[in-house]
A protein has these predicted regions:
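Conserved core architecture of multi-subunit DNA-directed RNA polymerases
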Residues: 1-294
Length: 294
């Protein structure tokens, strides 16, 4: 979620815009509390000298606009040395080269017009992850209500389900095989296997973001969809602003998302076959921001 104006072509590609060197775009005007220089970012990107890779890293505060107070958006026309900025970010992230396909925006639609850290876009491009306008990566599925299931139907072993709290079947017998019928917990979900590629890529992106940008340990360590079982996610209807916490317990071959009627109703008041989305919880915690919403 970084503005490049008309410089990125019809696909709004960051690398294509960077070939022009300097670009002029509308972004927030902020002042670093450490070095006193202007930076459009929440964390100052300025360097002491051109040859250095280390950035200031100080927190910035919004500067009073020089324009009219009647404008809905508070950004101002700013010159960005995009090619130099991307090269510095590449070196800071420890990448050999930048991904070719990094999508950007023509303009920022939020009130303050504060951009996301450009590093997030670079790492999304590395894993081919799309981004919604709130900073998260979502996968849409049709809602299908389900109340009971068998372990073999959700591609999860009964032993794994036992670890997740499914200790007894509907008849009160101890869970000990894949043929027993279990009652679905209200906040457990069974997404479509069609989401496999997207969710694995999102988990890998989040781990890379934690390691390269936040300098922390990876969280998901995912290689297959079975590694995602037990992970927390957020269910969200497109017309509401409140997500509902859920847990992934298995997968379905259907092109739909199976979940308890109470879960679907919590998202949108009913469960009559509408389409909602899920996003990984850590993605939401790291990347969602009300400040970048239109």
């Amino acid at each position: 979620l970084y503005p490049i104006g008309e410089n990125g072509g019809s696909q709004k590609l960051l690398i294509q815009a960077a070939k022009k060197g300097r670009i002029r775009v509308e972004m927030s005007r902020r002042i670093c509390q450490d070095c006193g220089k202007e930076s459009p970012n929440l964390i100052c990107h300025n360097r002491n000298s051109e040859g250095e890779v280390v950035e200031c890293g100080g927190k910035t505060i919004e500067r009073k606009s020089r324009g009219s107070n009647s404008r809905r958006r508070r950004g101002e026309r700013t010159t960005v040395d995009l090619d130099k900025l991307l090269e510095v970010k590449r070196r800071l992230l420890g990448l050999d080269r930048l991904p070719e396909f990094i999508k950007a925006q023509k303009e920022l639609l939020s009130e303050a017009q504060t951009p996301e850290p450009i590093e997030k876009g670079i790492l999304r491009g590395k894993f081919g992850v799309s981004v919604f306008r709130d900073g998260t990566s979502r996968y849409d599925m049709i809602d299908v209500p389900v109340t009971h299931f068998k372990p073999k139907e959700v591609h999860t072993s009964w032993k794994k389900l036992y670890e997740l709290g499914y200790e007894k079947d509907v008849f009160g017998k101890e869970l000990e095989n894949d043929e027993q019928i279990l009652e679905l917990f209200p906040q457990d979900i069974i997404p479509s296997l069609n989401a496999e590629e997207h969710l694995i890529a999102t988990c890998n992106f989040v781990d890379d973001l934690l390691v390269r940008f936040y300098k922390m340990e990876p969280f998901y360590n995912v290689k297959t969809v079975h590694d995602i079982v037990g992970s927390l996610a957020i269910g969200l209807a497109p017309h509401t602003s409140g997500g509902v916490l859920c847990r992934i317990i298995g997968w379905t071959a259907a092109s739909a998302g199976y979940a308890h009627p109470l879960f679907h109703a919590a998202k949108r008041r009913n469960c009559d076959g509408d389409e909602d989305s899920i996003l990984m919880l850590m993605d939401g915690l790291l990347n969602f921001s009300k400040h970048i919403l239109p």
